[in-house]
């Protein structure tokens, strides 16, 4: 790479202040470029340019977001002369008659993130130390991370430092590790740009720089792709099959403080669909953590190879050669299925720890941190209770918005209820299929009465007794337990 970011703290602070004054935010980008504008590619730049107004904010987006050269006087008018000088001092731009950004400065919420060029623009030319910005996996990692005041946080494979900065808002101290020196340079610059002084960057592979240390929050969006290559620091882990992800999970367990949480984006392999989650369940077993396995994409050999080499789709011959190399690699390993997803960990004392698996849609996941905390807290309480019927004496309330749906079948003439769904409308947006008759019990969970009393009242209202009342109680307990384990309900 022909340029290198420079963590000049004074210059970065000056630039950050100027960007805040002009209100360069994610919302502003969407307002000016449209809903799809935030994910713009290099090919879309000509259209984006023509959408921008002739204003100070428009000039800033043209230079920093679209990465187009602008007259130095125009950018000085928009941001101030000191900000233009800061762009040069931090290595972010070449300044002459025009200001030309070497990379991009992208607003992520109210943060500013510097990184390399447009992602995937010409991946074949990307150097091994290429540093990406706020990718879809970065967004997912953020959405799945429990937040709150903590002493220490750790971000593994920090890249441009997005997760480290998000943790730095509430952690007294954040350690960011990466094997790529250039990534740490970006992280240091981004920390300065956003005014963070509590992020420490350490060079090294994964957990090696923090040997013997523990943390309250651990995040990892390190290169988890199952790949026969070792080309890019941001994609290829360099170990066989899913060993890179296995190492991350097992080391995270060792480095979590008591009551700490880890959010790890990983991938795992399987020989067939019937055994698709065996690997992550094995990784998480035996440690002092409860785990939540969240598969997102489960792909066969060919689809996996295509997904991670889509940058070659305009070059049929090399594209085919790469696909053959990837599928042959997986075939030699006996791998039929590659799954990408997340593993969430919560460390707690006790002799019994549990895992569960739920498939999620990453397009629907949004700020699930509170849901995740409630879920792990509820699971710990359920372990303490012991017998399933002990839950009857507990008071439980819904923890957020849920939608109760009934399924009707009208094909036989008169509509007949055939199913029901409790849809969680926040966080991971998971749903629980159930029986129509249990929806009224869900609606009555306000924490004022015990679960046993709520179920007994429902049985009386329906005139149920004996085996029918026992069946209602059993089914209701199963449903309430499921809602607790998903973080859709809480103990009152």
Residue positions per predicted region:
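Conserved Class I SAM-dependent methyltransferase catalytic core
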Residues: 180, 241-295
């Amino acid at each position: 790479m022909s340029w290198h970011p420079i963590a000049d703290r004074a210059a970065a602070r000056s630039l950050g202040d100027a960007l805040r004054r002009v209100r360069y935010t994610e919302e502003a980008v969407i307002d000016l470029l449209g809903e799809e504008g935030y994910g713009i590619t290099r090919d879309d730049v000509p259209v984006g340019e023509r959408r921008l107004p002739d204003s100070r904010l428009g000039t800033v987006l043209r230079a920093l977001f679209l990465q187009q050269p602008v007259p130095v006087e125009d950018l000085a008018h928009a941001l101030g002369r000191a900000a233009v000088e800061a762009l040069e001092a931090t290595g972010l731009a070449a300044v002459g008659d025009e200001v030309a950004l070497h990379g991009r400065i992208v607003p992520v919420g109210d943060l500013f993130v510097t990184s390399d060029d447009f992602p995937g623009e010409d991946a074949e030319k990307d150097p091994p130390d290429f540093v990406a910005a706020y990718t879809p996996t970065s967004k997912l990692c953020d959405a799945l991370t429990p937040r709150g005041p903590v002493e220490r946080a750790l971000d593994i494979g920090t890249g441009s430092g997005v997760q480290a900065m998000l943790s730095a808002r509430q952690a007294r101290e954040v350690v960011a590790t990466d094997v790529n020196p250039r990534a740490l340079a970006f992280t240091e610059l981004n920390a300065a740009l956003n005014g963070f002084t509590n992020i420490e960057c350490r060079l090294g592979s994964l957990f090696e720089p923090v040997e013997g240390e523990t943390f309250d929050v651990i995040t990892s969006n390190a290169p988890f792709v199952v790949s026969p290559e070792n080309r890019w620091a941001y994609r290829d882990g360099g170990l066989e099959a899913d060993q890179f992800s296995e190492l991350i999970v097992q080391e995270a367990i060792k480095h979590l403080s008591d009551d700490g949480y880890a959010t790890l984006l990983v991938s795992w392999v399987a020989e067939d669909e019937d055994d698709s989650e065996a690997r992550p369940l094995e990784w998480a077993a035996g440690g002092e953590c409860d785990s939540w396995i969240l598969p997102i994409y489960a792909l066969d050999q060919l689809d996996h190879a295509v997904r991670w080499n889509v940058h070659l789709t305009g070059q049929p011959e090399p594209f085919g050669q790469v696909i053959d190399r990837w599928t042959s690699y997986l075939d030699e390993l006996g791998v039929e299925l590659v799954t990408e997803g997340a593993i969430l960990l919560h460390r707690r004392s006790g002799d019994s720890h549990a895992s569960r698996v739920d498939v999620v849609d990453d397009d629907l996941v949004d700020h699930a941190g509170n849901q995740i905390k409630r879920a792990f807290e509820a699971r710990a309480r359920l372990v303490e209770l012991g017998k399933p019927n002990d839950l009857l004496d507990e008071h439980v309330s819904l923890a957020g918005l849920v939608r109760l749906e009934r399924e009707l079948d009208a094909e036989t003439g008169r509509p007949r209820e055939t199913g029901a769904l409790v849809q969680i409308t926040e966080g991971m947006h998971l749903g629980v299929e159930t029986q129509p008759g249990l929806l009224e019990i869900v609606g009555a969970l306000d924490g004022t009465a015990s679960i046993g009393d709520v179920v007994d009242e429902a049985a009386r209202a329906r005139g149920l007794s004996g085996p029918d009342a026992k069946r209602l109680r059993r089914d209701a307990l199963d449903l309430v337990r499921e809602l607790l384990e998903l973080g859709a309900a809480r103990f009152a």
